[in-house]
Amino acid sequence: MKIESLDLPDEIKRFYENSGILELYPPQAEAVEKGLLEGKNLLAAIPTASGKTLLAELAMLKSVLNGGKALYIVPLRALASEKFRRFQEFSVLGMRVGISTGDYDRRDEGLGINDIIVATSEKTDSLLRNETAWMQEISVVVADEVHLIDSPDRGPTLEITLSKLRRMNPSCQVLALSATVGNADELAAWLDAELVLSEWRPTDLMEGVFYNGIFYCKDKEKPVGQPTKDEAVNLVLDTIKEGGQCLVFESSRKNCMGFAKKAVSAVKKTLSNEDRETLAGIADEIIENSETDVSSVLATCVRSGTAFHHAGLTTPLRELVENGFREGRIKIISSTPTLAAGLNLPARRVIIRSYRRYSSDSGMQPIPVLEYKQMAGRAGRPRLDPYGEAVLLAKSYEEFVFLFEKYIEAGAEDIWSKLGTENALRTHILSTISNGFARTREELMDFLEATFFAFQYSNFGLSAVVDECLDFLRREGMLEKDPDALVSTVFGKLVSRLYIDPLSAALIAKGLREAGTLTELTLLHLICSTPDMRLMYMRSQDYQEVNDYVMAHAGEFSKVPNPFNIAEYEWFLGEVKTSLLLMDWIHEKPENEICLKFGIGEGDIHATADIAEWIMHVTAQLAGLLDLKGAKEASELEKRIRYGAAPELMDLLDIRSVGRVRARKLYEAGFKSTAELAAASPEHIAVLVGPKITERIFKQIGRREAVSEFSDIEPLEKGSSDGQRTISDY
């Protein structure tokens, strides 16, 4: 099916033809035939790189040009940024594109001026909770990676959000994009959608197992040279020799880094002079953005053409790695499975070095087939690679047979709703009532019967869980006591708007009521004791140190569990460890020191602080509403967590481009406020932070003196990025 034959305005056809897209892939053509451009609901369950995003674009553009508004929902912030950059190309068609991924208690009415809005599932849910007016104007909703409805963490939010959007806008077109799953027909039936189910790919995918020096596919065998003792390194070299790149998936961050380092000496020999020059520039940027031990290792790897990628890296470092790979300079990325979750980063060959993952419940277990398929789907770059290869590694013949049967010859599992637990339902029941979607128990059950959970399980067990949630919400003062009506209290409405688990809100309110003196530690531990906080893992070497700290500061905790209750006490120690990380952060301990002390990555610091800033903001808001002590202290701590600094630096940190390191440098040099900066000479400031930053500072504080005449002045200390970031950038 040709682009020119589609029922689209000529300017859209020209846009794609000028981009080199003249003809639709078979699954795309099937989607058009099944009503994609006629406003029909559609589920596309097709492999990675088979053109799902183009389907979304065509549906959105058609709808917007007919006066509608499009919402594109993604599971990850990184994926939101990627799609936003892509959709901004539609500006030549007169389209306005917006993005929203954070600040969960804002309406973001300004986003409504856009024709296409990209948002995460959580942000979309919060926009609904805050009754954002333009949400009622949505004419087409795209749910990307909709198979993640199976995820215990993200699935319930996506499921409820889709249910609310469909009820709010019954005529709205829903386009769901999914990996190939076992029960795609069931998911399509729930969405009242036409199903496009296909295994077609634009590049052939050869899936197989590497054993004893040979890559075995279903219908062929391919010997691979063995220049080194590591089979995966040999597979990497074989790929580079044929002009390709590799993604290597590992089960842990440690293994990621280890393999990237292991491959350095071999990959370095394959680089051209141009590769080396470009990679040196990328490595320098990595060092400029971060001065931790991990970033130093990453820079060393990148200079040799290898890299690693995991959540312990900051967003800027991950983006540098991704861009270097897309440009073809970085030959191999060793990654945890997070890279398989939606980012557009294909490679000639995907190597899955470990197919087992650790579970606290059952130890090392084989990954699901669906997860394998997501990783394997990254093999083969459309229009660039003649084929793609997905390789599992076997150490024995028995393992070889197992891998073929488990992954190569098997289909993906069915996906199942994870909505039917009290933990999942508690927050969504409150928001459903607060938004007016349900005013009685009968209306609430009617709404929940439209969810995927009810579609799969009917009402089995749902009624009892709903009653438990309603009892909890009434008991904690978030719902009125009226047994015949469901009405949120002012407290309940605020909890819903703040996008916090009602249990977290109840724990915060109880903690503030019962606390004696509120210290930094008291408030930090209070937010770390909520289910919304992501806790640090307790290593064996942590127990004694954290326990000693608890004994020395017992009076600052609202309650210390009995150490003989082992499970409860260990959980408590994890809360304390996380509190201590935040304590070090707000007292300006260097990031590398924090990383080494807690056994984490720089990205973990920022992710933890990001969540903590949000929960501390919630704490300040709840304390203010309920007239509890701690509102002022929590508000001050919220800002300190945002910047990772002591109170005296807050005035300086209100200036963009001044982060915790530069603020401390300016403060120690005698410039303790924006007023003192305004009275200073540009030359003096430039010696401290450099001319570029000085120019930015002076523009913001109302002095636009040119600093170009002293552009040769270097700052006293080099190494910090020109664009220091706050937590919200991560």
Curated annotation (Swiss-Prot):
Q: Which residues bind ATP?
A: Q28, I46, P47, T48, A49, S50, G51, K52, T53
Q: Which UniProt keywords apply?
A: ATP-binding, DNA damage, DNA repair, DNA-binding, Helicase, Hydrolase, Isomerase, Nucleotide-binding
Its recorded reaction(s) are:
Couples ATP hydrolysis with the unwinding of duplex DNA by translocating in the 3'-5' direction; ATP + H2O = ADP + phosphate + H(+)
Locus of motif DEAH box: 144-147
EC class: isomerase
InterPro entries assigned to the protein according to its UniProt record, in alphabetical order: DEAD/DEAH_box_helicase_dom (IPR011545), Hel308-like_dom4 (IPR048772), Hel308_SKI2-like (IPR050474), Helicase_ATP-bd (IPR014001), Helicase_C-like (IPR001650), Helicase_Hel308 (IPR022965), HTH_61 (IPR046931), P-loop_NTPase (IPR027417)
A GO BP annotation? DNA repair
Q: Which residues form a coiled coil?
A: none
CDD domains noted in UniProt: DEXHc_archSki2, SF2_C_Ski2
**GO MF:** 3'-5' DNA helicase activity; ATP binding; ATP hydrolysis activity; DNA binding
Kindly give the PROSITE patterns that the UniProt entry links to this protein: HELICASE_ATP_BIND_1 (PS51192), HELICASE_CTER (PS51194)
Is the DNA-binding keyword given for this protein? Answer: yes
Q: Which residues form the Helicase ATP-binding domain?
A: 33-199
- Where's the Helicase C-terminal domain? 232-433
Provide the E.C. number(s) assigned to this enzyme: 5.6.2.4
Q: Which HAMAP family does the record cross-reference, listed alphabetically? A: Helicase_Hel308
The Swiss-Prot or TrEMBL record describes its family as follows: Belongs to the helicase family. Hel308 subfamily.
Role description: DNA-dependent ATPase and 3'-5' DNA helicase that may be involved in repair of stalled replication forks.
Q: How does it assemble?
A: Monomer.
Q: What is this protein called?
A: ATP-dependent DNA helicase Hel308
Q: Which organism is it from?
A: Methanosarcina mazei (strain ATCC BAA-159 / DSM 3647 / Goe1 / Go1 / JCM 11833 / OCM 88)
Task: Print the organism lineage.
Answer: Archaea, Methanobacteriati, Methanobacteriota, Stenosarchaea group, Methanomicrobia
Name the gene behind this protein.
hel308
